[in-house]
């Protein structure tokens, strides 16, 4: 009611304003106006309700038609609003005119009152009927709107129907054309069959057939064209015409400037064949992104050309830098300030202190005195707190002398046993060195680079470095192979003060993206951890390439547990006036490790290993070291069968798996690890109690590092080494390691070594101790390039692709295979097969018997070796037993031994003495015989797959059937470097036949199979580092 009253007041006020001219109003006029007001109010309410209803209806309808006719619905709404506004204006004008009429007709007010009353009654009675009429009107309006919508829908449907009719008509026309073309083609084909016969002159006609076939294909494709595709083709044609018009217009404009454009126009207009060919490829190639992704076959690049281009690019990027042309920022290396307590120490006190600290020996001038506590080395409080937090109470012997020497800015060679804290010895001075320099700007490389030989050691150093770098606000990036390079590139681009890397991946980073990933301009501190392995011949080129790109006045530090004398000369090439700090002698196993060496047979090693595992595994973790990846996997299977859960770690495992295996082993998830020497360096595992050298280490340094995995940080450890009699040459290094570490040498090991020395002396050989540093890496020189070219020539020759200049290469590979065969040919005269029954004694037989007796007498005369020699060995033994004397070995003269040795040598050299040939001729001169041809092909030194291919049952059977020769496999396989014992032979194929041609055919087929396999191996060859460690 409040709203109605307000409305009533507003309406009355408006009426008061409109009727302000006649101020004198009668009571009857007021009543009639009130009635009119009431009626108008009721009408307004009805109108509002009806409008709201109509709005709801319209909304629901508009929702249904929204997707198809949004714009039309908006126009209808606007037209409705216009109609409503017009109707409102009409109502207002009518109400105003009524008011004027009421004011002008005041004299006949009574009659009008009566009329008004009667009208009000009629309206009151017919109120319901008026409402119904209004509803009818609204329904009619809605129906009109529906009709309008239906009209639009019908119009759309009509358009679609016409479009379909056009498409159907077009399809029908296409079908008719296709049928006509097919009929014509059939007629032509029949005419050609009837009227033509093939001749050499018709070769030119065959060239036209593909074009006709293409036409037929295009016409058949047109039959199955979808209407939408046809429409899109029309659009493309229009776009193309538009582009051609624009090109022609541009050409016409440019035609005035010079004659060159005229040539372009003529090319476009005359070369129709090119345009047709382009049509088949696709339209608008400049706008077709999908088509641009595919390159044409004509633009293929030669693989070898691309490879050589890449190699030359790599060489350019990694060439040594001319440091004289670069202005480097000055930096400070000497930060060490000697505290008064150390300054007061005399030289004698310093020597005594060094002797107490496990016998520190120092070489080099100007070495500072060793420190006694962390506060004396000049590090910040943040680092001191971190040291205390992580349990570093006091410096170890190597740290006491190495830290002040490095803080003084000197180059250093640090030699200390495993687990002695070498990592902290070079990390603490590095932090002080970096903090003294300005912070990195965008695009600048690191300040410190730490290089390691293995990925595991790189990860371990990174983990140790991050303990301190977080508090100092420094960034550390570990760069190593085997993982995705993109993440490492992203980290380097963000900037890092410290890079821990393996040399191979570091070179990749320096060469990546034309050297924009990182650079070595800011590097002033270089660390080589495990420096002896870094300077092994396999690693030297990569290490030197990185070091040569660093500024010459850098500070370089080297650390290792072993440092052979042969490596010192190489190390001094990159050091300037170094100080050598050695702790505890060179390469010594820690005294906390109890070492045991067991001389054992190969078959009993696994049972002994199970015994050790049963005794030690409950006390902690165990590492078993083997020499090869295959042995690691084989031993893993054997241990799993014996119910020992374990894991294997070697260079052939993916890097992600290697990381997870090391983490599981460190965390104690798995307590047994079978590994090659990949895990022997820098791997720090807590609670590692036992190391088993299942395969004996082949040099001293390898033994030291293997045994050094246990007994770290003052804990007790055990190291067992298995050695067989065949591995006696390694016993000397193990005896040396035991003696230097103060461990008693087992007597059976000493006996094994002394027997081996005696044997070598008897054979006239010199005993050489292997240092383990004889591996060779890639030298990137002309010799290697020549070898690579030779390999390519052999491949070309084998495949028949050689040039006329390279015809000799075809013979080379056959000559190499022939030399490896080391073939031995023999021709034997065999007796002709006859009847098994003995022949009757005839005159001929008697003559043969006489010849045999004479030969026997002559042999006895030639071999007149005394009375004992005429009696056989059995007779000698019988005589000894009858006499009752001791049974002695039968006496054999030196001449007999010499003859036996000569026969063996002759057999090896495939030599038949002349005397024997004469005897055979005399024996077989009058007998019926046939020749048997034999040839032996030694295949022991060929690759395993080549041997398998030749010695397979199917291959031998196929060769025998083809050549009609018998082929047998004889001898045993001996690995490279191992010579067969007396009476044994390397594996070989024996070919036998009565026909010499059959033997030659069999040999040629065997040669062909081996050649194919060798070529296949060369093509699939991946250059790998055969050493124990890899730079990845």
Curated annotation (Swiss-Prot):
Residues 201-211 have a biased composition (Acidic residues). Belongs to the DEAD box helicase family. DDX46/PRP5 subfamily. The gene is Ddx46. The modification Phosphotyrosine is found at residue 294. A motif (Q motif) lies at residues 372-400. The modification N6-acetyllysine is found at residues 263, 776, 904. Its EC number is 3.6.4.13. Its main location: nucleus. This is Probable ATP-dependent RNA helicase DDX46. It comes from the Eukaryota. One of its GO terms (molecular function) is RNA helicase activity. Residues 26-49, 112-200 have a biased composition (Basic and acidic residues). CDD domains: DEADc_DDX46, KH-I_DDX46, SF2_C_DEAD. Residues 592-753 form the Helicase C-terminal domain. One of its GO terms (biological process) is U2-type prespliceosome assembly. The lineage of its organism: Eukaryota, Metazoa, Chordata, Craniata, Vertebrata. It holds the Pfam family Helicase_C. A motif (DEAD box) lies at residues 529-532. It is found in: Nucleus speckle; Nucleus, Cajal body.
């Amino acid at each position: 009611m409040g709203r109605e009253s307000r409305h009533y007041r507003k309406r009355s006020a408006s009426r008061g304003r409109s009727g302000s001219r006649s101020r004198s109003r009668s009571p009857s006029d007021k009543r009639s106006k009130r009635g009119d007001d009431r009626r108008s109010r009721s009408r307004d309410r009805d109108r509002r309700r009806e409008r709201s209803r109509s709005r709801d209806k319209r909304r629901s309808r508009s929702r249904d038609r929204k997707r198809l006719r949004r714009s039309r619905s908006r126009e209808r709404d606007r037209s409705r609003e216009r109609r409503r506004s017009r109707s409102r204006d009409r109502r207002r004008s009518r109400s105003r005119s009524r008011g004027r009429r009421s004011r002008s007709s005041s004299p006949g007010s009574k009659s009008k009152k009566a009329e008004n009353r009667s009208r009000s009654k009629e309206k009151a009675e017919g109120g319901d009927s008026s409402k119904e009429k209004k509803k009818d009107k609204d329904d009619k309006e809605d129906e009109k709107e529906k009709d309008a919508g239906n009209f639009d829908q019908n119009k759309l449907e009509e358009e679609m129907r016409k479009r379909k009719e056009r498409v159907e008509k077009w399809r029908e026309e296409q079908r008719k054309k296709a049928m006509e073309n097919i009929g014509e083609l059939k007629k032509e084909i029949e005419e050609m069959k009837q009227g033509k016969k093939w001749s050499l002159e018709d070769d030119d006609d065959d060239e036209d057939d593909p074009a006709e076939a293409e036409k037929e294909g295009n016409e058949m494709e047109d039959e199955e064209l979808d209407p939408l595709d046809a429409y899109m083709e029309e659009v493309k044609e229009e776009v193309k015409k538009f582009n051609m018009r624009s090109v022609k217009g541009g050409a016409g404009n440019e035609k005035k400037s010079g004659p060159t454009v005229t040539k372009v126009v003529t090319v476009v207009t005359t070369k129709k064949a090119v345009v047709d060919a382009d049509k088949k490829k696709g339209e608008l190639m400049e706008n077709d992104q999908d088509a641009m992704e595919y390159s044409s076959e004509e633009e293929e690049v030669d693989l070898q050309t691309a490879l050589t281009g890449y190699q030359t690019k790599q060489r350019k990027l990694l060439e040594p830098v001319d440091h004289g042309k670069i202005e480097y920022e000055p930096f400070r290396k000497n930060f060490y300030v000697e505290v008064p307590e150390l300054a007061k120490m005399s030289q004698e006190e310093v020597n005594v202190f060094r002797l107490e600290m496990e016998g520190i020996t120092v070489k080099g001038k100007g070495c500072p005195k060793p420190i006694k506590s962390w506060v004396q080395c000049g590090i910040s409080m943040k680092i001191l707190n971190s040291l205390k937090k992580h349990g570093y109470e006091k410096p170890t012997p190597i740290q006491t002398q190495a830290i002040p020497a490095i803080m003084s800015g000197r180059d250093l060679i640090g030699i200390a046993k495993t687990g002695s804290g070498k990592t902290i010895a070079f990390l603490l001075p590095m932090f002080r060195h970096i903090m003294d320099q300005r912070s990195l700007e965008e695009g600048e490389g690191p300040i410190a680079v730490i290089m390691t030989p293995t990925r595991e050691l790189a990860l371990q150093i990174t983990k140790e470095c991050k303990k301190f770098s977080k508090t100092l606000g420094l960034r550390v990036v570990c760069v190593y192979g085997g993982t995705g390079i993109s993440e490492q590139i992203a980290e380097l681009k963000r900037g890092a003060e410290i890079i821990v890397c393996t040399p191979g991946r570091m070179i990749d980073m320096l060469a990546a993206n034309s050297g924009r990933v990182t650079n070595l301009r800011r590097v002033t501190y270089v660390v080589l951890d495990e420096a002896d392995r870094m300077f092994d011949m396999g690693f030297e080129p990569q290490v030197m390439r990185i070091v040569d790109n660093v500024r010459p006045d850098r500070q370089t530090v080297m650390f290792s547990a072993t440092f052979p004398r042969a490596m010192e000369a190489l190390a001094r090439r990159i050091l300037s006036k170094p100080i050598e700090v050695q702790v505890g002698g060179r390469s010594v196993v820690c005294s906390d490790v109890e070492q045991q060496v067991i001389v054992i047979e190969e078959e009993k090693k696994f049972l002994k290993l199970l015994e050790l595992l049963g005794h030690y595994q409950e006390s902690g973790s165990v590492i078993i070291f083997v020499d090869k990846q295959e042995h690691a996997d084989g031993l893993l299977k054997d241990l799993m069968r014996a119910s020992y859960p374990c894991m294997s770690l070697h260079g052939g495992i993916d890097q992600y798996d290697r990381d997870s295996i090391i983490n599981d082993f460190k965390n104690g998830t798995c307590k047994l690890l079978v590994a090659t020497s990949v895990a022997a360096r820098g791997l720090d595992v807590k609670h590692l109690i036992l190391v088993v050298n299942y395969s004996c280490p082949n040099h001293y340094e390898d033994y030291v590092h293997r045994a050094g995995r246990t007994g770290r940080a003052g804990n007790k450890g055990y190291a067992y080494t298995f050695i067989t009699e065949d591995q006696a040459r390694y016993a000397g290094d193990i005896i040396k390691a035991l003696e230097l570490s103060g461990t008693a040498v087992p007597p059976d090991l000493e006996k094994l070594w002394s027997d081996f020395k005696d044997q070598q002396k008897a054979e006239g050989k010199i005993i050489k101790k292997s240092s383990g540093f004889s591996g060779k890496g890639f030298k990137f020189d002309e010799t290697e390039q020549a070898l690579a070219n030779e390999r390519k020539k052999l491949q070309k020759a084998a495949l028949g692709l050689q040039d006329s200049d390279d015809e000799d290469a075809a013979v080379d590979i056959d000559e190499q295979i022939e030399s490896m065969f080391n073939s031995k040919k023999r021709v034997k005269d065999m007796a002709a097969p006859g009847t098994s029954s003995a022949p009757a004694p005839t005159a001929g037989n008697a003559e043969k018997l006489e010849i045999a007796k004479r030969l026997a007498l002559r042999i006895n005369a030639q071999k007149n070796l005394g009375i004992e020699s005429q009696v056989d060995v059995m007779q000698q033994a019988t005589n000894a037993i009858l006499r009752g004397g001791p049974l002695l070995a039968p006496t054999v003269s030196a001449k007999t031994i010499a003859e036996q040795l000569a026969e063996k040598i002759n057999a090896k050299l495939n030599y038949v003495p002349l005397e024997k040939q004469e005897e055979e001729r005399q024996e077989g001169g009058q007998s019926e015989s046939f020749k048997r041809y034999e040839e032996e092909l030694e295949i022991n030194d060929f690759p395993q797959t080549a041997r398998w291919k030749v010695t397979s049952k199917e291959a031998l059977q196929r060769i025998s059937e083809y050549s009609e020769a018998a082929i047998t496999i004889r001898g045993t396989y001996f690995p490279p470097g191992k010579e067969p014992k007396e009476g044994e032979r390397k594996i070989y194929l024996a070919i036998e036949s009565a026909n010499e041609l059959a033997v030659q055919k069999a040999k040629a087929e065997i040669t062909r199979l081996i050649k194919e396999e060798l070529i296949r191996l060369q093509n699939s060859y991946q250059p790998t580092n055969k050493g124990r460690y890899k730079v990845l």
